C-alpha cells in the first residue's frame, strides 16, 4: 500500500510490478487534477477502484470516464453513493435498473452504496446486499468499502467477486 502525492510517485507505482490495484477518490479533491490522475491510472494495467471525488470529478463529462474504462483490458470498479450515481448516470428509474444500466454503460462493476447496497456487472448480473444497516450512512464508511474492494482485488479475486464479498463483509 502506498499513498501517491506526485507524478514521480505515480510513475513509481505504475512501474512496480508487485502492485496490481489502485484506489483513487477518498480524500482527494474534485477537479481537473483528479480527472488527470484517474485517466492516467485507467491507461495502466492496474485494476482500478474509483470512489468519491474520483467519480464526482467527471460529473461534467462522464463519457470521458466511460470511454477510458471501455478502452482498457484491466478491471475497473465504481463504488458510488446515490449522489455520485445521479451525477454520472442520471437519476430516473428504479434503483436496480439504474445500477444495471450504469454498469453496462460504463463497462465497470458498479457498487451503489446504501442500506441495501447493490452490485452490478456489465453482463447484467446484479445482487442486493441484505446484510446492510443504516449505520453505513456514517461519513467515511464508503471509503472503508472501497478499501475492502481494493484489498480483495489485490488478492486476485475477480472484480465481481471482490465487490460482492466486500459489500457483504462491510455490512
Task: Please tell me what each predicted stretch does.
Residues 146-171:
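Conserved post-catalytic alpha-helical subdomain immediately downstream of the catalytic base
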Residues 134-136:
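Glycine-rich phosphate/pyrophosphate-binding beta-alpha loops
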Residues 88-89, 127, 138, 159-163:
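Extended hydrophobic-aromatic, low-complexity segments
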Residues 1-131:
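Glycine-rich phosphate/dinucleotide-binding loop and adjoining beta-alpha-beta core of small-molecule
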